[in-house]
Amino acid sequence: IHTGAYAEALGVTEEDHEFNRVVEAVARGGESALKVNAGHGLHYENVERIAAIAGITELNIGHSIIARAVFSGLAEAVREMKARVDKAAARR
């Protein structure tokens, strides 16, 4: 699922609309017995909402992690992102 429109949404109304489109796409993928992955534009501030969607099996977040790693180191950048994703996934 391409999450770019969600990531680039301006304002709460547009973000909610794009989030709901992602939720619907994940549901349709699940109904078709597809393995659903999601990503594009996800970063430390917006990943938790997407990661909390039941049915997503993998997130693609590379750019944000590498950008953060420039300042904090790769291990810390990955650890921080993993903590955010795990926290959100626990709410599923």
Functional labels for PLM-detected ranges:
Residues 1-10, 55-74:
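Glycine-rich phosphate-binding active-site loops on the catalytic face of alpha/beta enzymes
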